[in-house]
Amino acid sequence: MIRYRAAWVVPIAAPPLRDGWVDVDRGRIVAVGHDRTQAVHQEDLGAVVLMPGLVNTHTHLELSYLRQQIPPSDAFVTWVRGVMAARRSLPDAQAVEVLDAVRTGIREAVQSGTALVGDISNTLVTHAPLVESPLSAVLFYELIRFNAPDAAGLVADACARIEALEKSVHIRASLAAHAPYSVAPSVFREIRAAMEPRTHLPWSVHLAESRDETEFIGSGGGEWRTFLEQVGSWDPAWTAPGVSPVQYLDDAGFLNRRSVVVHGVQMSREDLARLSARGATLVTCPRSNAFTGAGTPPIASFYASGVPVAVGTDSLASTPDLNVFAELAAMRSLAPAVPASQLLESATLQGARALGFDAEFGSIEAGKRARLLAVTIPATVSDVEEYLVSGIEPGQLSWVGESADASRVGDS
């Protein structure tokens, strides 16, 4: 057993400890404290904050090759059209450029302090690189089909594909539906039914991301109707329900404690109350929302509603990096009154809970994996939690102990 001492320990599940320590044995946390007792084997890390590795609850690693390829937009549908055009230019999901970019994205995520990700994939191309990496993950195989005459067959095929993946103790595979404007109601219901017996797995969806989505579900018109008709995906049998996107998915039975709901930029108070009542987790990605023209997420309202809030960077197609600390800084600027402790919990324990990995990640507690992150801080810092949500650069970070050894995989 080894004891790691630090100027601060931020357990997440408890208040910060000045002059704290964490005991680790064979990769597991044994105890946390802040007294002066000495251990037989001890390492003093000095002027650092010792905290759990971060959780990036929503990203798209397979889009990493689109970094700086798509300009920002003030209209979300316009931005999506840009993504589709860029993806058509490199149709082979297994292309060397795609795989190299995925591995680079994984390496950058590890170097910026991430231990666990929720990764959305339309192709499952990221599975092998994730298995080879030090990251743990839920890989969400995402379905997009608005006109789906055989929803049951579509979902059964998707389940067969994820079941056929190489088994890994640190990578789990599940399903995602893209969004209410791009997935048929029958597909939402079939995903829910297929995932019901897989009780250890969450499912995911982009929800209430843009005003165009609200208009489409409310009236059946607008930019998404035009888009679906242009790409040949419109279903003439579909009728707009005339409700909010959140109520639409709730009525389909898609929202519960296992739902990982992404964005929520356009959610009303009623929507947030409904989401809170269902126990779903809301993942916010404010930097991506600004880039894509989706809008500004009401971060303070998210927390006030009681909805569990997690953090995602989204993809490198819409953000400059995969640094969750940078996402926290964006959240802090949008919600200056939200306690820093809550923001940090969103980037750690709430994300781990949403992904079903909270027995292993998200906090420094006895029995959990010792995926420990050391953050160098100035000696003058007195409010360590506020410092951590104000913008941390990868150069301030290092992994500790066995985590450091494992993370060297990301440097290869």
Which stretches of residues belong to each language-model region?
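N-terminal metal-binding scaffold of metallo-dependent hydrolase/deaminase domains
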Residues: 1-38
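C-terminal cap of metal-dependent C-N hydrolases
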Residues: 353, 369-412
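His/Asp/Glu-enriched, well-ordered alpha-helical/loop segment
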Residues: 226, 251-254, 295-379, 397
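Histidine/acidic residue-rich metal-binding segments in metalloenzymes
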Residues: 1, 39, 126-133, 155-281, ...
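Divalent metal-coordination and catalytic microenvironments
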Residues: 7, 22, 27, 47, ...
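Alpha-helical scaffold segments that flank or form the walls of functional sites
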Residues: 49, 67-133, 156-168
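Active-site gating loops and adjacent loop-to-helix segments of metal-dependent hydrolytic enzymes
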Residues: 65-99, 134, 138-144, 210-258, ...
